[in-house]
Amino acid sequence: MIERYTLPEMGKIWTDTYKLQTWLDVEIAVCEAQAELGYIPQAAVDEIKAKAKFDPQRVLEIEAEVRHDVIAFLTNVNEYVGDAGRYIHLGLTSSDVLDTALALQLVASLDLILEQLEKLIQAIRYQAQQHRYTVMVGRSHGIHAEPITFGFKLAGWLAEVLRNRDRLVRVAQSIAVGKISGAVGTYANIDPKVEAIACQKLGLEPDTASTQVISRDRHAEYVQQLALLAASLERFAVEIRNLQRTDVLEVEEYFSKGQKGSSAMPHKRNPIRSERLTGMARLVRGHAVAALENVALWHERDISHSSVERVAFPDCCILTHFMLKETTDLVKNLLVYPENMKRNMNVYGGVIFSQKVLLALVEKGMNREDAYRVVQGSAHQAWNTEGGNFEELVRADAQVTALLSAEEIDQCFDPQQHLTNLAEIYSRLDI
């Protein structure tokens, strides 16, 4: 991923140096396990741990000749270790190292993602608490529907990110597996106990039934969950973009001092953060498809997945982490305009209260079809008339006033009637 969208702590996990260090960590854990079981001398392990290191540039030089990254790495490590190096990689295949080390990278990445997700949860919950009863219009199909509150809208966001957190916690367990089982997974040249001990040292569980690789359904699930999270963040971003439209302007991204929105139009204050999040979600979703394609490897393994994963895993983890940070900052600094919300809600003189009028008439004994016709007629007249006022038309309709008193009509147009049960929802989310 390009540096522009890479936060340092996540970018570090996907550097060559970090990757090679995880390879070395796996090799040393295996050596320690073999020594504990009496397969190799403890003195050799001590020497390996004291001398083992690598030079990323030297590894690349060797790989240019041998055309195999793990062999290049082992060759470089042995240049430092000397004779004790013969015990490194004993009974292993390259994927024992690659897949186990990859699990360490994916777990470390998910730790950062979950940490940032917690910050987003706190930011959304705080804003929801501040706007529990900030009344605005709810929209369906992009059209005014009925009153809601901005806190209620944010409650939906909060519930969604909490579900994302639950899914990521589950996938963290699924991906935290290693394999030290040899060329086709049968432990033909290594004791399964070595795998168990080595994985324990690394904080992993042994894979249940690996081949030459860990089955890619685990990795596909991992990327799917990141894609789901990215899709949620995109949903929030798209909502902000729509609410920031000039003719809506109910919320707005924070516009910092000195910031400029257009090279041509000085007045512009564009929702660029939300737009950027929308684009990033497309990238993560694209990688989710590629991760699914990687599941169907040939027999006990082919290498078709490798080139995909060298791009997809770093990109997905780095982008998702960046998106979370951007969304958190966006929510924390979001500008909210309650007066504009109230203004928009009252367009056409209260057509959004049409259902309340309909139900009130039905409760008074009017046939539902007749009530619908009466209310729709006034609503559409208000809608189609410049400066139309639905409430005034309702109050002037003899069919309505024959059944509803002025006080009962007042109640129909009271926004608070729509908010009476919000406390139940808020209590579920600690808002």
Curated annotation (Swiss-Prot):
Pathway: Purine metabolism; AMP biosynthesis via de novo pathway; AMP from IMP: step 2/2; Purine metabolism; IMP biosynthesis via de novo pathway; 5-amino-1-(5-phospho-D-ribosyl)imidazole-4-carboxamide from 5-amino-1-(5-phospho-D-ribosyl)imidazole-4-carboxylate: step 2/2. Catalyzes two reactions in de novo purine nucleotide biosynthesis. Catalyzes the breakdown of 5-aminoimidazole- (N-succinylocarboxamide) ribotide (SAICAR or 2-[5-amino-1-(5-phospho-beta-D-ribosyl)imidazole-4-carboxamido]succinate) to 5-aminoimidazole-4-carboxamide ribotide (AICAR or 5-amino-1-(5-phospho-beta-D-ribosyl)imidazole-4-carboxamide) and fumarate, and of adenylosuccinate (ADS or N(6)-(1,2-dicarboxyethyl)-AMP) to adenosine monophosphate (AMP) and fumarate. The active site is at H141 (proton donor/acceptor), S262 (proton donor/acceptor). Disulfide bonds: none annotated. Signal peptide: none annotated. N(6)-(1,2-dicarboxyethyl)-AMP binds at residues 4-5, 67-69, 93-94, 212, 263, 268-270, 307-311. The keyword Lyase applies. It comes from Synechocystis sp. (strain ATCC 27184 / PCC 6803 / Kazusa). PANTHER family: ADENYLOSUCCINATE LYASE (PTHR43172:SF1). Its EC number is 4.3.2.2. This is Adenylosuccinate lyase. Pfam families: ADSL_C, Lyase_1. One of its GO terms (biological process) is 'de novo' IMP biosynthetic process. Gene3D superfamilies: Fumarase/aspartase (C-terminal domain) (1.10.40.30), Fumarase/aspartase (Central domain) (1.20.200.10), Fumarase/aspartase (N-terminal domain) (1.10.275.10). Homooligomer. Residues from neighboring subunits contribute catalytic and substrate-binding residues to each active site. Belongs to the lyase 1 family. Adenylosuccinate lyase subfamily. It catalyses: N(6)-(1,2-dicarboxyethyl)-AMP = fumarate + AMP; (2S)-2-[5-amino-1-(5-phospho-beta-D-ribosyl)imidazole-4-carboxamido]succinate = 5-amino-1-(5-phospho-beta-D-ribosyl)imidazole-4-carboxamide + fumarate. One of its GO terms (molecular function) is N6-(1,2-dicarboxyethyl)AMP AMP-lyase (fumarate-forming) activity. Coiled coil: none annotated. Keywords: Lyase, Purine biosynthesis. InterPro entries: AdenyloSucc_lyase_C, Fumarase/histidase_N, Fumarate_lyase_CS, Fumarate_lyase_fam, Fumarate_lyase_N, L-Aspartase-like, Pur_lyase.
